[in-house]
Amino acid sequence: MKRARGFTLLEVLVALAIFAMVAASVLSASARSLQNASRLEDKTLAMWIADNRLNELQLEQTPPSSGRNQGELEFAGRRWEWRTQVDSTAEQDMRRVIVWVAAKPLGRERGSIEERAAARLVGFLGSQP
């Protein structure tokens, strides 16, 4: 009797099990990579917005007064919220500015902009001589 050549059912099942485990780990790694890329994009765009906001305050004719201010804008096809806090410093002509930027929530996300912020930028503004 001639022996048939090929794989047994057990060998095929073991190979499929190994392939399934490898495929699951590859899919999991690629999903994490996509999440990280999305988070990095959010942080980059938010930092650009915060930097722009700080530059806008620097270009104003009069230095900003102490207190909080907030607003919304569209940037890169998305809605964003920003909040600035201006504080006086020991130096009379110097102001400390904190800018928070967060993506506008789509649903019922809770929390302040400070808690949801993708970027937080601290800078100092001085009056022009």
Swiss-Prot record:
One of its GO terms (cellular component) is type II protein secretion system complex. It is found in: Cell inner membrane. Belongs to the GSP I family. Gene3D superfamilies: GSPII I/J protein-like. PANTHER family: TYPE II SECRETION SYSTEM PROTEIN I-RELATED. Keywords: Cell inner membrane, Cell membrane, Membrane, Methylation, Protein transport, Transmembrane, Transmembrane helix, Transport. It holds the Pfam family T2SSI. Disruption phenotype: Deletion mutant results in a non-functional T2SS system. Type II secretion is composed of four main components: the outer membrane complex, the inner membrane complex, the cytoplasmic secretion ATPase and the periplasm-spanning pseudopilus. Forms the tip of the type II pseudopilus by interacting with XcpU, XcpW and XcpX. Interacts with core component XcpT. Component of the type II secretion system required for the energy-dependent secretion of extracellular factors such as proteases and toxins from the periplasm. Part of the pseudopilus tip complex that is critical for the recognition and binding of secretion substrates. Type II pseudopilus confers increased bacterial adhesive capabilities. One of its GO terms (biological process) is protein secretion by the type II secretion system. It is a single-pass membrane protein. Its main location: membrane. Cleaved by prepilin peptidase. Methylated by prepilin peptidase at the amino group of the N-terminal phenylalanine once the leader sequence is cleaved by prepilin peptidase. The modification N-methylphenylalanine is found at residue 7. It comes from the Bacteria. This is Type II secretion system protein I. Residues 1-6 form a propeptide. The chain crosses the membrane at residues 7-27.
